[in-house]
UniProtKB/Swiss-Prot annotation:
One of its GO terms (molecular function) is terpene synthase activity. Mg(2+) 3 binds at D463, E471. The gene is TPS14. Mg(2+) 1 binds at D319, D323. Belongs to the terpene synthase family. Tpsa subfamily. The lineage of its organism: Eukaryota, Viridiplantae, Streptophyta, Embryophyta, Tracheophyta. It catalyses: (2Z,6Z)-farnesyl diphosphate = (E)-alpha-bisabolene + diphosphate; (2Z,6Z)-farnesyl diphosphate = beta-bisabolene + diphosphate; (2E,6E)-farnesyl diphosphate = beta-bisabolene + diphosphate; (2E,6E)-farnesyl diphosphate = (Z)-gamma-bisabolene + diphosphate. It holds the Pfam family Terpene_synth_C. Mg(2+) 2 binds at D319, D323. Mostly expressed in roots, to a lower extent in flowers and, at low levels, in fruits. One of its GO terms (biological process) is diterpenoid biosynthetic process. InterPro entries: Isoprenoid_synthase_dom_sf, Terpene_cyclase-like_1_C, Terpene_cyclase_plant_C1, Terpene_synth_N, Terpene_synth_N_sf, Terpene_synthase-like, Terpene_synthase_metal-bd, Terpenoid_cyclase/PrenylTrfase. It comes from Solanum lycopersicum. This is Sesquiterpene synthase 14.
Length: 568
């Protein structure tokens, strides 16, 4: 006991010594972030509490086989097959049936291609099929919707009587690419009419419409969709009890797995001693884990979630160091040290920065150790290259702030799409996921793809829209809003409109690669798509001020039960 007390005392003295070496005469642009809303909550999820029983595993496999049978035995030519696939995807269990769904959608697409002239006037079926087929990366022409328009290209008013048809047309529009004017028209038409009819709908349909208008299926995070749709689905009179039982049990088992991982990561975070070593930074361990789960939620991605969470934690602290605490003169040697990525650089940086630098070094050591097991240690090179780009871009922002520079929009975006860290996270996702990726595919993603820069632009502009007011309450570098206002002598509102226009176009770039970059496996594109979805669901600056929507979402995924034993 005496030894432990001595060790703790030594640790406290060391921390005090590090912090006491900060020049207190320097004025620092402190952001005054709120403390974590979760603190050590997830430490309570012990291995015993999160253990998955052999009975649960057995029951899951039995139910999965029955759902698989249901999926295989339903004819690919039937409307029921489309509805079943859509339901399985929304309920979050499609990952169990990837191959079956892939084969079915291929058959459905082939059948459509052979019978294009067949007269199908059911908007619900046409729109649902369009969304599911494009969702599996088959290019189905948007001309399928021409039959629902008048000679002037406007959608027929008679369609307003078909709520499910309108809802599915609305959902389909979010898979549009550049130049699809009919889908632009469809989006405007469906939003207008769904909003006006929503108050008159029955509770179940009203819930679906309300949720869709807030967040369409395609741009939503699949793991977030699942618990919300489970609650909607069990209130649909025609729901399938067996399917409902399966999805609830699957959600429950995955939730236990995520709780255990959160508990382990909370211990790691506690050992980092945030409040003493990084008091200037956001305390966002749980939110970082949510981000990682939004990219990869399946049981096979435990390592990926751990490594991505740690990376986002390090990026968050580093971002706050550059953005809300350190001086420019302190940041120059720190940037050089990160580029060197070696222990000998430790003496060149301010003492209070050294704990973070050590965590940074430890992270890349851990990555190298993990990838060596897979024979993929050479992948670490790509992560280090992206980290160097990121850290240099942080310094560029600090330089702009120091010199009161508001750059032109294009110059701002070139730098800011790096500082949003989307590319760093994306490349790390691909590195740690455990899949084989060729050098050519890495090079394509980094240098040639539309999807990677589009995803970064969405993240940057959405972050600037939702975080702008908070950031301008303190000394902070210019966002896209300030750059646009200055360059074009525009209002803030006009800047927001332009940012949203560019976000919409970036989604079309994502969809273009998703549909047409057929040489690239889906698992390579999926993380970029999911990273875009993660930021798209945020309504305010939820990552920084995570006491509202994001807190409720995290609770929904990692705390609340879906009653796995009570199945309708």
């Amino acid at each position: 006991m005496a030894t432990n007390l001595t060790l703790e005392t030594d640790k406290e003295i060391k921390n005090m010594n590090q912090l006491s070496m900060i020049d207190t005469t320097i004025t620092r642009p402190l952001a005054n972030y709120h403390s974590s809303v979760w603190k050590n909550y997830f430490l309570s999820y012990t291995p015993q509490l999160t253990e998955i029983s052999s009975q649960e595993k057995l029951e899951l496999e039995e139910l999965k086989e029955k759902v698989r049978q249901m999926l295989v035995e339903t004819s690919d030519k039937s409307t029921q097959k489309l509805v079943l696939i859509d339901t399985i995807q929304r309920l979050g269990v499609a990952y169990h049936f990837d191959n079956e769904i892939k084969i079915s959608i291929q058959n459905i697409f082939d059948e459509f291609e052979q019978n294009k002239n067949e007269d199908d006037n059911d908007l619900y079926i046409v729109a649902l099929r369009f969304r599911l087929v494009r969702g599996q990366r088959h290019y189905m022409s948007s001309d399928v919707f021409k039959k629902f328009t008048n000679d002037d290209g406007k959608f027929k008013e008679t369609l307003t009587k078909d709520v499910q048809g309108l809802l599915n047309l609305y959902e389909a529009t979010h898979l549009r690419v550049h130049g699809e004017q009919i889908l632009e028209e469809a989006l405007s038409f469906t939003v207008t009419h769904l909003k006006s009819m929503s108050p008159k709908l029955d509770s179940s349909l009203k819930a679906q419409v309300s949720e869709a208008l807030i967040q369409p299926i395609y741009t939503n995070v699949p793991r977030v969709v699942a618990p919300k749709y489970i609650r909607i689905y069990e209130n649909i009179e025609s729901h399938d009890d067996l399917l409902l039982k399966f999805v609830k049990l699957d959600f429950h088992i995955l939730q236990k797995m995520h709780q255990r991982e959160l508990s382990e990561l909370t211990r790691w975070w506690k050992d980092l001693d945030h409040s003493n070593k990084y008091p200037y930074a956001r305390d966002k361990l749980v939110e970082c884990y949510f981000w990682a789960t939004g990219v990869y939620f399946g049981p096979q991605y435990k390592r990926a979630r751990r490594m991505i969470t740690k990376l986002i934690v390090i990026i968050t602290i580093t971002d706050d160091l550059y953005d809300a605490y350190a001086t420019y003169d302190e940041l120059v040697p720190y940037t050089n040290a990160v580029e060197r990525c070696e222990i000998s650089a430790m003496d060149s940086i301010s003492p209070y920065m050294r704990p973070l630098y050590q965590v940074f070094l430890d992270y890349f050591d851990e990555m190298e150790e993990e990838l060596t097991k897979d024979g993929k240690a050479h992948y670490v090179y790509y992560a280090k290259v992206e980290m160097n780009k990121l850290i240099k871009s942080y310094l560029k922002e600090a330089e702009w702030l120091k010199n009161d520079i508001i750059p032109k929009c294009e110059e701002y975006k070139r730098n800011a799409t790096i500082t949003v860290a989307n590319q760093m996270i994306l490349i790390t996702c691909l590195i740690v996921a455990g899949e084989f990726i060729s050098k050519e595919t890495f090079e394509w993603m980094i240098n040639e793809s539309l999807i990677a820069p589009a995803s970064s632009l969405i993240n940057r502009l959405k972050d600037d829209i939702i975080g702008h007011e908070h950031e301008q309450q303190r000394e902070h570098g210019a966002s896209f809003v300030e750059c646009y206002v200055k360059e074009y002598r525009a209002s803030k509102q006009e800047a927001y409109v332009e940012a949203r226009r560019q976000i919409a176009n970036a989604w079309k770039d994502i969809n273009t690669d998703y549909l047409h970059a057929t040489q690239v496996p889906t698992f390579v594109l999926q993380p970029a798509l999911n990273l875009s979805r993660l930021v798209d669901i945020l309504q305010e600056d939820d990552f920084t001020d995570s006491q509202n929507f994001l807190k409720d979402t995290i609770k929904l995924l990692f705390v609340d039960s879906v009653n796995s034993t009570s199945c309708g």
